[in-house]
């Protein structure tokens, strides 16, 4: 990624952030410090301090596994990120929450829809329950008092990261949000409500978070739920355990007698959840180094459990995959004032955090979610709490139609109905939308029975954002072969998720075939970014080369057309998939386009 694409927006969308310029935008990337083992950590800190002394700004992105390495206990290897990376910047601009929102909005405007699809967990409910049972055994044996057990949700993210962040920020406004463009082309979208530690002029402040309840938006109901959460014996016990752990951790670098707990069991609403926090404060020893501070505090006890070391060993045993930046740390370090060893800094605990891989049209994503487990935890209840915490992401609606166009007549009924139902059902499942196969079939059959007895018709079956199905019909006018095709002026990105599904997000395609139609042609053919033929705006395409019909593979970026599949499976056609370049198209012996309404048609 070029330096301009590396940035960090640390975004305070809380009410306090609305009133004061507490968000920070870091630009003019000056370099990245990394380490892949504990041996390199002190060098990273030393280089970071040197950069800060030069007046640069530092944004650390630290993995949970860094803590295990610092404690010299087992940790699963990271394959797609360093153990720690510190982004260095020349510029830091302070912003209000509204200014931060405007900065994101200007980069999200005019982009294609952004969202997530194909959400899947690396731990199912049975495995989750089994892990909780094993944790209870460890607690009974005296190994631990509380374990923060977590798992991962994997998904596909599509659209602009700015547009996706904008949508999620509206659902989960928090004081420790972050949108970070990473040097490898990946991105972090964090919506964390939890402070790990903040240093301000010698004072350390930690605000561990334990205790969750649903928030519904009704002020009176939420007030009752907040009061119940604040008084809940189990949640108070969990919270207090972590407060004691944080008091002990802070005490290792604090001036004697300065560790205090000014606030216990505060409840705050963040989006669809209520969270209980407590505040721990201490005065930092003047001689404490950054290395000592991290050794004492990292990782945050709220996302391990107590006691920290043994509990982290249990976590490594029970969790199947590394956590990465989830439950590690994200934050900022300011340059020191004259005479100071280091300046102010602030680190959040990156919960509710999306890690996105590199990519343009489609990125692989991961979200960690977990719960604090004590002996009397109810496994099913804890699993439900995890699902609640993830709802800000998993409940993000994909607000576009998914549809099929089907050739039908009163006499013959709908053509290839099973194939159409299978395709729309697969698309609905991918985009997280309910789909009733039997209801869809009945709607189409009823629509056919209502058609005039003469003529051929186009049925359009659509699933709306609310998952409701609707079917409409229109007469299908005849066409005469061969049809004419033209070449589209623009190219497509083969990673664009909307090329693989029939949705209403097809403005470029509709404009292309309509422009072609205005010139007397049937369709416009597209090429992708690699110069490979893909499809038409409303048809798949086959070319005849050396006596063989060839159609581009789906990996080129195209719709898995119903008629395309029929032709590939039909022995009479002897058609195969293959890459088709511009030169091959120009030399082709024949061209054939097809769709579900028209079937195969020779083209020129």
PLM feature segments, named:
Residues 1-406, 528:
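Extended alpha-helical targeting/anchoring segments
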